[in-house]
């Protein structure tokens, strides 16, 4: 009986002998270490969201440069059309031309600075951005001040008959009904031309407003990136403190 009991005890103890090992504790320690290593790597590594935000801001800047170049061309073209029509007093000051040229230079230099880099290109880009902002503001002020001034050759007496300038002894060649029809048709086309020129001036003012907004986009993107970077840094510090 005692021998059987001994063998029975040995048989009961043998299966339980390998159980009190340190495998579970060792695995738990490795998992904590792995978490710490992953947390450190994620703290040092640039997050995917930050890279995505950087790409988005870069695309916005490129779009603003393209918009500046296109709007600069439109400003020069519209200014040339209005100058041919002798329409605005601001054409004598050259507002559409120097505003458009500065905007085109700002966009082109921004592309060159992004491609080549360098301190000189960066300084030139900053100066042209400031110049584009100032010229857009000045052009808007000049254009809004001269919006209702019609300084062109289509005056109110352009459709009047030239018989008043003749001597009274000279007979009238054109009959009165035909002369009235001619004056009415002349006034109709003149009013259409005035509406067209006013529309062109409104388009030019809109181009300058868009140029003003486009010149402010780099500043807004810079401030937004600073705010985003600060928020991400604070989030990382809070995560490291919790770990």
Curated annotation (Swiss-Prot):
The modification Phosphoserine is found at residue 42. It is found in: Membrane. It is a multi-pass membrane protein. One of its GO terms (biological process) is negative regulation of dendritic cell differentiation. The keyword Nucleotide-binding does not apply. Disulfide bonds: none annotated. It comes from the Eukaryota. The chain crosses the membrane at residues 65-85, 92-112, 122-142, 204-224. One of its GO terms (cellular component) is membrane. The keyword Membrane applies. Keywords: Membrane, Phosphoprotein, Transmembrane, Transmembrane helix. Pfam families: CD20. Interacts with MCOLN2. Belongs to the TMEM176 family. This is Transmembrane protein 176A. The lineage of its organism: Eukaryota, Metazoa, Chordata, Craniata, Vertebrata.
């Amino acid at each position: 009986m005692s021998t059987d009991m001994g063998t029975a005890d040995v048989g009961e103890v043998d299966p339980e002998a390998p159980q009190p090992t340190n495998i579970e504790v060792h695995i738990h320690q490795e998992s904590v270490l792995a978490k710490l290593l992953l947390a450190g790597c994620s703290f040092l590594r640039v997050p995917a969201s930050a890279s995505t935000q950087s790409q988005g801001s870069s695309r916005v800047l490129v779009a603003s440069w393209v918009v500046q170049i296109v709007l600069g061309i439109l400003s020069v073209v519209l200014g040339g059309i209005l100058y041919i029509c002798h329409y605005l007093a601001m054409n004598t000051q050259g507002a559409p031309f120097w505003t458009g040229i500065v905007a085109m230079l700002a966009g082109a230099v921004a592309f060159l600075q992004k491609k080549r880099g360098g301190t000189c290109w960066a300084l030139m880009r900053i100066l042209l951005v400031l110049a584009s902002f100032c010229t857009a503001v000045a052009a808007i002020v000049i254009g809004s001040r001269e919006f209702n001034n019609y300084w062109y050759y289509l005056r109110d007496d352009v459709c009047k008959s030239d018989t008043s300038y003749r001597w009274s002894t000279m007979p009238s060649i054109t009959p009165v009904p035909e002369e009235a029809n001619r004056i009415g048709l002349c006034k109709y086309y003149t009013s259409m031309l005035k509406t067209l020129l006013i529309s062109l001036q409104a388009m030019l003012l809109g181009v300058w407003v868009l140029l003003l907004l486009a010149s402010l986009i780099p500043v807004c993107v810079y401030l937004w990136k600073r705010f985003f970077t600060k928020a991400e840094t604070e989030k990382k510090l809070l995560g490291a403190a919790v770990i």
